[in-house]
Amino acid sequence: MARPMGKLPSNTRKCAQCAMAEALLEIAGQTINQKDLGRSGRMTRTDNDTWDLASSVGATATMIATARALASRAENPLINDPFAEPLVRAVGIDLFTRLASGELRLEDIGDHATGGRWMIDNIAIRTKFYDDFFGDATTAGIRQVVILAAGLDTRAYRLPWPPGTVVYEIDQPAVIKFKTRALANLNAEPNAERHAVAVDLRNDWPTALKNAGFDPARPTAFSAEGLLSYLPPQGQDRLLDAITALSAPDSRLATQSPLVLDLAEEDEKKMRMKSAAEAWRERGFDLDLTELIYFDQRNDVADYLAGSGWQVTTSTGKELFAAQGLPPFADDHITRFADRRYISAVLK
């Protein structure tokens, strides 16, 4: 899931106890910072950078899988991902392995109970949103599914797909190869016809998808979970345009819209992320999220899709929390992240 910021004020040091939660908020919320709108050159990434599940963007997939493992063990869990913990263990990042297994608690890395509980609930809500999206799509008769930037997503294995469903997973070659091998070692069997498509989404993935058997004449359910902030603005537009071009009428798309923060929120966020990075580094894990995400101004996702012929529905994190009867939290910063929008759309 840091750039020098000077000495942290006392209230931020106190909030730094939320290290793990803050980083997961950053990943799940896909933050765009108002101060950085219109700026470029802030990234250390390159146009053709690659990664595995223990480095760079790939490590964030392992972090989210860690959170799914924790959410699956929660009292009255909203989700059940039995593959999350063994996959995290297979990746081998010690910090995440110990957290996912329960050997290390969030509190052990300085995370107070409220932030930790919110983080677990947040990932559960996000996961359930996409689980329900696919359930609704298949209930409507869709039998072709595309999971973009699949990472350690195990929906092909854990969701009850109707007979005849075909699931295409797209991600970088090293990620696809690792997950496929790790799940085979667990003797896991997919519940649908699964096709792993090893291609970078910045390359010609539509051709690779069609070469794997994808039929653009059939309605499809696409997901782009926690993805858009890892693409430059033009890349986001190209991705959405490609999805539209591949979509037959009645196709569906689920994604998240990056959250725009004002200047004060931007400064506080950087301080919190600095605390998270320091806490991780003390545990032997070195990752600076500010080097992974593109901060440049981009088109509003909901508006862009609507302009391309999609019928768009949005829900905030707050609304999804309330729908599950989960309590709000007093921390204003955490509550702000619950304003992020979850988007589902149908092509008409």
Swiss-Prot record:
Binding positions (S-adenosyl-L-methionine): D171, D200, L201
Top EC class of this enzyme: transferase
InterPro entries, alphabetized: Ppm1/Ppm2/Tcmp, SAM-dependent_MTases_sf, SAM_mthyl_Trfase_ML2640-like
UniProt key word S-adenosyl-L-methionine: yes
GO terms classed as biological process: methylation
Sorted UniProt keywords: Methyltransferase, S-adenosyl-L-methionine, Transferase
Molecular function as annotated in GO: methyltransferase activity
Domain of life assignment: Bacteria
Gene3D superfamilies: Vaccinia Virus protein VP39
Protein name according to UniProt: Putative S-adenosyl-L-methionine-dependent methyltransferase MRA_3439
Species per Swiss-Prot/TrEMBL record: Mycobacterium tuberculosis (strain ATCC 25177 / H37Ra)
Taxon lineage: Bacteria, Bacillati, Actinomycetota, Actinomycetes, Mycobacteriales
